[in-house]
């Protein structure tokens, strides 16, 4: 794997990312969350996309794709490893979201091309990065209170918002992915909260990917609704 080639591709691709609001909706009808993980010791890449109706944030569709991992883990180049599975899950969706939240960084990346920006650009959809750990940049000490907020800065440029979404939890790093400015990114993430650390779209994507209790319960409720239709 030629790191110099990947770095050059990152730099060239980053220039195509749109960092301001570029969407027609005043309120999205459908919001998706995307999450990527690895199975079988990293040999298989698994991507899950959960599609939610807005503003109710009700799960209406999900897709999971598993593909053979074609690239080793290289710090700073994770998006190249993850996007093939994300594209496979995206292609299976029956509906297209108006807005996409990706578990990972957008422009808050050393070369400004995290997975949220890379994937958002590939599918040309307004995209927000919601990361759980800092990748680059610095921020002022954050208050312990829920809602505490600080800009993540790098070389004089704001890359993300550092936001404590839940009391006694580590903050999230919310960044532009593609076609969504920083102010709007924070706004839409805040509107997708329902008392957990993560916004509902990425929380549901994780639940789908990991077959968590919430997702099992949702499946059971759907099965019961199909078996006992309303009179």
From Swiss-Prot:
Q: Name the catalysed reactions.
A: Endonucleolytic cleavage at apurinic or apyrimidinic sites to products with a 5'-phosphate
Location(s) in or outside the cell: Cytoplasm
UniProt GO molecular function: deoxyribonuclease V activity; magnesium ion binding; RNA endonuclease activity, producing 5'-phosphomonoesters; single-stranded RNA binding
Task: Give the record's keywords alphabetically.
Answer: Cytoplasm, DNA damage, DNA repair, Endonuclease, Hydrolase, Magnesium, Metal-binding, Nuclease
Q: Does the keyword Ribosomal protein apply?
A: no
**What cofactor does this chain's UniProt record say it requires?**
Mg(2+)
What is the predominant subcellular site recorded for this chain? cytoplasm
Where are the residues marked Interaction with target DNA as a site? 73
- Check the record and name the Pfam families matching this protein: Endonuclease_5
| Record: residues binding Mg(2+) | 35, 103
State the EC number(s). Answer: 3.1.21.7
Its BP terms in the Gene Ontology are: DNA repair
- The question of whether Transmembrane is a record keyword is answered with no
Give the UniProt entry's GO cellular component terms: cytoplasm
Family listed: Belongs to the endonuclease V family.
What HAMAP family does the entry give? Endonuclease_5
Function (record text): DNA repair enzyme involved in the repair of deaminated bases. Selectively cleaves double-stranded DNA at the second phosphodiester bond 3' to a deoxyinosine leaving behind the intact lesion on the nicked DNA.
Q: What is this protein called?
A: Endonuclease V
Protein species of origin: Sodalis glossinidius (strain morsitans)
Q: Which gene encodes it?
A: nfi
């Amino acid at each position: 794997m030629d790191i110099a080639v990947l770095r050059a591709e990152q730099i060239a691709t980053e220039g195509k990312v749109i960092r301001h609001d570029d969407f027609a909706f005043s309120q999205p009808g459908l919001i998706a969350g995307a999450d990527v993980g690895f199975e079988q010791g990293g040999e298989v890449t698994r991507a899950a996309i959960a599609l939610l109706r807005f503003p109710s944030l009700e799960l209406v569709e999900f897709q999971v794709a598993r593909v053979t991992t074609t690239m080793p883990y290289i710090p700073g180049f994770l998006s190249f490893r993850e996007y093939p599975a994300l594209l496979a899950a995206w292609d299976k969706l029956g509906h297209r979201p108006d807005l996409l939240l990706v578990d990972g960084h957008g422009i808050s990346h050393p070369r400004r091309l995290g997975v949220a920006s890379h994937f958002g650009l590939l599918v040309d959809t307004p995209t927000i990065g919601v990361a759980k750990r800092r990748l680059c940049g610095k921020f002022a000490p954050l208050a312990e209170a829920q809602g505490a907020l600080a800009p993540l800065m790098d070389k004089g440029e704001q890359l993300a918002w550092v936001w404590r979404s839940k009391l006694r939890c580590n903050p999230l790093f919310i960044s532009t992915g593609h076609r969504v400015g920083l102010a709007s990114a924070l706004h839409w993430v805040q509107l997708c909260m329902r008392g957990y650390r993560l916004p509902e779209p990425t929380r549901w994507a994780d639940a789908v990917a990991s077959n968590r209790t919430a997702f099992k319960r949702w499946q059971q409720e759907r099965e019961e609704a199909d078996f006992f239709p309303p009179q």
